[in-house]
Amino acid sequence: MGRVVVDVMPKPEILDPQGKAVAGALPRLGFGQFTSVRQGKRFELEVDGPVTPEVLAAAAEAAEQVLSNPVIEDVVRVADAEADAAATISSGNLA
């Protein structure tokens, strides 16, 4: 069974009150090095079988038509979750 990850973010010109609230809290909690936060959404779509280019194309279409509001959001990533996790682990980043 495969899995596709879709990340959606607010368009840059759209106010992000959740991100602003998090950005305000970070310095108070000892994380002053972060100056800005944008909060988005992550979707994980499971499929029967492997993630093929056709599955990724269908996920991208679903992301544009159903998972995001194109007036205020951008789809910033559609990826095979397994390949994405392998890249994250090999780079030493947190998964």
Write out the residue ranges for each language-model feature.
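Non-catalytic terminal accessory/regulatory regions of metabolic enzymes
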Residues: M1-A95
